[in-house]
Amino acid sequence: MRAILALEDGSVFIGSHFGATGTEVGEACFNTSMTGYQEVLTDPSYSGQIVTMTYPLIGNYGVNPEDGESGKAQVSGFVVAELAKVHSNWRATESLGPWLEKQGVIGIEGVDTRKIAKHLRSAGAMRACLTTELTPEEAVEAARNAPSMEGCNIVDKIGSHPMTPEEVDALVTGKTLPPAEYDIVAFDFGIKYNILRQLRENGFRVTVVPAHTTAEEVLAMNPDGVFLSNGPGDPATLTDIHREVAALIGKVPMFGICLGHQIISHALGAKTFKLKFGHRGANHPVKDLKTGKISITSQNHGFAVDPDTVPDDVEITLINLNDNTVEGIAHRTLPVFSVQYHPEAAPGPRDPQYLFRDFRKMIAASKRQHAR
């Protein structure tokens, strides 16, 4: 069956269908990772996006029950050069194509994904339509009528999934869990399972709460720390969440990743802006401005913190070496820090996993200070 990917600028790519049938719209973006397609597909941060994978063969190791970052596929559509028809991996339970069909995700193969990526890199991320039923002209029109990612609150669309510490513990399989030394509250804006695993494996007892939990409700739980998760959409739209997070700053140690980093930045008085085509892949170099150390990081974001709006009492700690955008901040006197990239490495390099230990150290230092 024929499938069509149409962009709002009139570009049309015709290929073959796999997965579900129908019509979907979303923001076209690309990911340069060689592996980790199951994590990409199930990452809630990709909600509302039609994802193009630049690696030429996708699906060769199938899908399995362990590698999902949420309970279902989250993308609006999936674009590959070639779909592997036969998978080979001892953990795999089914092939990618049939799994996507069950998940209701439309896929297209047989298109030049590197051409698509270069076009999006030059022209910028744009609205798109992926369809098995419309004409090319109708698909372009559907793309042009799709909502823009800028100004779009997707956190409320995907909803939150509160979890007890026992439910978080159940996500960690095949490992002996360390003692849970500190109790933390994790805001769910679209939290990835592997972030929860890393938090638990680093000695945190994690309670996951909904995105719109108030500061008063959090403080009533008497946590040792607060974690702000990744998530989709425009961070500037989450003004009520900015307000609640601002009310927590200074009262409890805080760490944020990706959207959580952007929310902390807004709460501290900074602003965010939309990147031309975003950072999505597993090989982004980030420089620590204090130590000069460079880490290779996994990233997935279409917005960034505007460095010109960062207040004087907040320090920019990390920058992206590809475009010098802000990759991390920390308050100069209060126990608050955040990073734009994904230290949990799912998929991607594990260079920055020390950040979870840094969060532990921050909490320990805060508790010592308050014990005096």
UniProtKB/Swiss-Prot annotation:
Keywords: Amino-acid biosynthesis, Arginine biosynthesis, ATP-binding, Glutamine amidotransferase, Ligase, Nucleotide-binding, Pyrimidine biosynthesis
Region (CPSase): 1-179
PROSITE patterns in the cross-refs: GATASE_TYPE_1 (PS51273)
MF (Gene Ontology): ATP binding; carbamoyl-phosphate synthase (glutamine-hydrolyzing) activity; glutaminase activity
Positions annotated to bind L-glutamine: 45, 231, 233, 259, 262, 300, 302-303
Active site: 258, 342, 344
Top-level taxonomic group: Bacteria
BP-aspect Gene Ontology terms: 'de novo' pyrimidine nucleobase biosynthetic process; 'de novo' UMP biosynthetic process; glutamine metabolic process; L-arginine biosynthetic process
E.C. numbers: 6.3.5.5
Catalysed reactions listed for this entry: hydrogencarbonate + L-glutamine + 2 ATP + H2O = carbamoyl phosphate + L-glutamate + 2 ADP + phosphate + 2 H(+)
Domain Glutamine amidotransferase type-1: 183-369
InterPro entries: Anth_synth/Amidotransfase (IPR050472), CarbamoylP_synth_ssu (IPR006274), CarbamoylP_synth_ssu_N (IPR002474), CarbP_synth_ssu_N_sf (IPR036480), Class_I_gatase-like (IPR029062), CPSase_GATase1 (IPR035686), GATASE (IPR017926)
Pathway: Amino-acid biosynthesis; L-arginine biosynthesis; carbamoyl phosphate from bicarbonate: step 1/1; Pyrimidine metabolism; UMP biosynthesis via de novo pathway; (S)-dihydroorotate from bicarbonate: step 1/3
Subunit architecture: Composed of two chains; the small (or glutamine) chain promotes the hydrolysis of glutamine to ammonia, which is used by the large (or ammonia) chain to synthesize carbamoyl phosphate. Tetramer of heterodimers (alpha,beta)4.
Similarity annotation: Belongs to the CarA family.
Entries under HAMAP family matching the protein: CPSase_S_chain
Role according to the record: Small subunit of the glutamine-dependent carbamoyl phosphate synthetase (CPSase). CPSase catalyzes the formation of carbamoyl phosphate from the ammonia moiety of glutamine, carbonate, and phosphate donated by ATP, constituting the first step of 2 biosynthetic pathways, one leading to arginine and/or urea and the other to pyrimidine nucleotides. The small subunit (glutamine amidotransferase) binds and cleaves glutamine to supply the large subunit with the substrate ammonia.
Protein's name according to its UniProt entry: Carbamoyl phosphate synthase small chain
Organism of origin: Akkermansia muciniphila (strain ATCC BAA-835 / DSM 22959 / JCM 33894 / BCRC 81048 / CCUG 64013 / CIP 107961 / Muc)
Top-level taxonomy: Bacteria, Pseudomonadati, Verrucomicrobiota, Verrucomicrobiia, Verrucomicrobiales
